[in-house]
Amino acid sequence: MSIPFTRWPEEFARRYREKGYWQDLPLTDILTRHAASDSIAVIDGERQLSYRELNQAADNLACSLRRQGIKPGETALVQLGNVAELYITFFALLKLGVAPVLALFSHQRSELNAYASQIEPALLIADRQHALFSGDDFLNTFVTEHSSIRVVQLLNDSGEHNLQDAINHPAEDFTATPSPADEVAYFQLSGGTTGTPKLIPRTHNDYYYSVRRSVEICQFTQQTRYLCAIPAAHNYAMSSPGSLGVFLAGGTVVLAADPSATLCFPLIEKHQVNVTALVPPAVSLWLQALIEGESRAQLASLKLLQVGGARLSATLAARIPAEIGCQLQQVFGMAEGLVNYTRLDDSAEKIIHTQGYPMCPDDEVWVADAEGNPLPQGEVGRLMTRGPYTFRGYYKSPQHNASAFDANGFYCSGDLISIDPEGYITVQGREKDQINRGGEKIAAEEIENLLLRHPAVIYAALVSMEDELMGEKSCAYLVVKEPLRAVQVRRFLREQGIAEFKLPDRVECVDSLPLTAVGKVDKKQLRQWLASRASA
């Protein structure tokens, strides 16, 4: 039994195999190639697992789940945080030929119900330390409402569902049965900020290539010691090159529960971490922590800081080498496929001011206008892409696929970009972030980047607010070091030489900005704040 999904046309699949992108290997190969190694694969608090131990634990769990009736071709819903059991579970399910959805630990009732409704899982794996599963009320209701669930395993459980017991029970003559390499390996989550994230089917072939090529570009080796402080289940942390890239290279993943400086700085020093990945808000927190007295000596081993998940302003980018003392690599990718990196030997100009260029020669990327017509080089428009690791359709979502893809199979991500003569991409924002003020279009990220130049501004987010006369006006939400008045903000922006219509109509200074589950500023919530105040 195989999971239905939108496949690549045969001529594309043949070309990707001929060029060596697709090598018909299951993702389990990332781990099993090191199965005899006693090198440390994962550090989780005081626990350390070698590659041999990680592989054996995955075999044990897979064998236990098979005994409980879980079969190839079925699906699983998994919600685990930044713990070693996430990787044990991931590889165990791949070995069984079971395709999981890896829900983020921050997801709640609505998201879990939506995922379960879409994939009809046979298996649920969760953690008693999550508020939803701390008791049995939600669990019982969830399993009743989603009757496809036959098996439940819970981390930190003392009863019949104990995941740790299943992991510790020795495997008996276990033989892996991964799904074929051109079938669905697992589901990633769309990074969209509106509604429940859509499900993205990723095959072994396309995802393995993405990991393998990322490892080559980022030069991960057995000496790589990677701090995973962003959500480990997120695509960025899994494959760019992420933890899977570390495992492929034979390096070590060090897990952190969150990206706070107070937690991460000591871990970097203790485990001699040499690479990590952050989202821009976390970069700001690290820089602020150093200003406030955290010792930079703790970061002496850190050689490379990847930043992605949202566009990094040039202002912040320029501070990283000088203040953190390591090389910056910008990452612009999407769970749907396409990944762009600045290269390690790029000029400072490219690293600071662009988001890199595609990692595969067969990544087809162009810029379209609102009607889908190609735009000249350098102009800002909608990103269109297809390639050997960019999917061809969301799972069970024909209506959305009809608008997300053009007739030639190019995916429209909703990102607004420009491409320079050398192929480097600069992200200008999102279509939905464009504010239409009386017919004048304002790209929110342009104003946000200018606001971040102000010495008193730590974070900035520009959102639209409804206006009876203009249709929309703009509101700037700021997290500041010292009080700022709207008149001061507008004066500063005027000094940057921008048009008057781009000046924020309203300025709100707040203690913090709300974030989505993947660490991006939650502009939907900011707009809701405005709407609630307007109706009060």
Curated annotation (Swiss-Prot):
Pfam families the record matches: AMP-binding, AMP-binding_C
Species of origin: Escherichia coli (strain K12)
Region (Phosphopantetheine binding): 438-439
CDD domains to which the protein is assigned, alphabetical: 23DHB-AMP_lg
Expression induction or repression: Under conditions of iron deficiency and by the fur protein.
SUPFAM superfamilies (alphabetical): Acetyl-CoA synthetase-like
Enzyme Commission number(s) of this protein: 6.3.2.14, 6.2.1.71
Residues forming coiled coils: none
Signal peptide: none
Main location as per UniProt: membrane
Protein name as annotated: Enterobactin synthase component E
Subunit structure: Proteins EntB, EntD, EntE, and EntF form a multienzyme complex called enterobactin synthase. Monomer. EntA and EntE interact together.
